[in-house]
Amino acid sequence: MSFDRNQVPNWRPGYRFQYEPAQKGHVLLYPEGMIKLNDSASLIGGLIDGQRDVAAIISELEQQFPGVPEVADDIEQFMEVARAEHWIVLA
């Protein structure tokens, strides 16, 4: 089954993506705690706005990182993990 890049990701209610100086990086805050995101997840997370579809996020990051062939696959993997962990909803 292929990933539908026309889906629009949005953070679930109660989840907030932000930079946390104490963690020296981006985190995902939620009522029960916090998840520290790695650099690539932070780049993807920064583009999740409830407006852009996955294809637009891929396009944006492919422009920022030309010549990196796995960008699209990495973004799809992030979306699948984030959905499985209930961080995002895909509509």
Curated annotation (Swiss-Prot):
Single GO MF descriptor: quinone binding
Domain of life: Bacteria
InterPro entries, per database record: PQQD, PqqD_bac, PqqD_sf
Keyword annotations of the record: PQQ biosynthesis
Pfam family, one: PqqD
One GO-annotated biological process of the protein: pyrroloquinoline quinone biosynthetic process
Pathways per UniProt: Cofactor biosynthesis; pyrroloquinoline quinone biosynthesis
Protein purpose: Functions as a PqqA binding protein and presents PqqA to PqqE, in the pyrroloquinoline quinone (PQQ) biosynthetic pathway.
Subunit structure, as described in the record: Monomer. Interacts with PqqE.
UniProt cross-references to NCBIfam families, sorted A to Z: PQQ_PqqD (TIGR03859), PRK02079.1 (NF002535)
Family membership: Belongs to the PqqD family.
Protein name: PqqA binding protein 1
Annotated organism of origin: Pseudomonas putida (strain ATCC 47054 / DSM 6125 / CFBP 8728 / NCIMB 11950 / KT2440)
